[in-house]
A protein has these predicted regions:
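Noncatalytic alpha-helical scaffold of FAD-dependent oxidoreductases
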Residues: 1-244
Length: 244
């Protein structure tokens, strides 16, 4: 498992499929870049597994799933022959997109051994908050309202039920729910700004207040620090672990 190439100008990287997702994140972090596929299991899952299952992750709403983040593949077929599709060209409209057959096929068509991935500029700022709502329908209504109300990139919108949050609070040390009133549903929302936006907080506050006034959401708490943001994300990322 190794990094084959990293091109900050072209915003691409080529890696072997055995690399952990967390290792890819670390390489991008060192170079002030971002690979936006993000999963709670990133410390143990490989990019090859992510490709084989076409993983979505918490950034799928804005960046797309793994298929949308992949430019090319190297694949070994059942007869041992190797297909090299490791392109790094973004505007490539030639021929069949064979990579799309292998992504999500779970190894049934061939074994993915390397991949060309898209990387992105790292956001300058992130704004995280946790809201509560009465139902999934109300949560989706809030999503539509956000999408209509601002051009600030909405990079995460995760709906979580009360039972899942209770399980995390019970079984994960240090887990904290920043909203004082219990709710049936919770929404983790994160905006990312790729330039310093002095009006972003005010605009997001306006949207949240409108959601509260219209009773689309019941409550909302902003993360005022990276520590508070991490506490909110820990609720979402530990749901699977808390159920073991």
């Amino acid at each position: 498992k190794k990094l084959i190439s990293f091109n900050k100008i072209n915003e691409t990287m080529v890696v072997q499929s055995g690399m952990l997702l967390s290792e890819i994140h670390a390489i991008c972090e060192e170079n002030d870049m971002l690979f936006p596929l993000s999963l709670a299991s990133e410390g143990s899952c490989t990019i090859g597994g992510n490709l084989a299952t076409n993983a979505g992750g918490v950034g799928v709403l804005y960046y797309g799933n793994t298929r949308e983040l992949t430019l090319g593949l190297e694949v070994v077929l059942s007869d041992g022959s190797i297909i090299n599709l490791l392109k790094t060209l973004k505007k490539d409209n030639t021929g069949y997109s064979l990579k799309d057959l292998f992504i999500g096929s779970e190894g049934t068509l061939g074994i993915i051994t390397a991949a060309s991935l898209k990387i992105f500029q790292k956001p300058k700022e992130k704004f995280t908050f946790l809201a509560s709502s009465r139902s999934p329908k109300k949560s989706l209504e809030f999503l539509r309202m956000i999408q209509k109300s601002t051009s600030i990139p909405l990079t995460s919108f995760e709906i979580m039920n009360n039972n899942s949050i209770k399980t995390v609070l019970k079984n994960i040390d240090g887990a904290i729910l920043p909203i004082s009133e219990e709710a049936e549903w919770y929404i983790l929302i994160e905006f990312s700004s790729y330039e310093k936006n002095l009006d972003a907080v005010d605009r997001i506050n306006e949207i949240v207040n409108l959601g509260l006034e219209k009773k689309i959401i019941s409550n909302a708490v902003f993360a005022n620090s990276k520590k508070q943001s991490k506490q909110i994300w820990n609720l979402r990322e530990n749901i699977s672990e808390a159920q073991k």
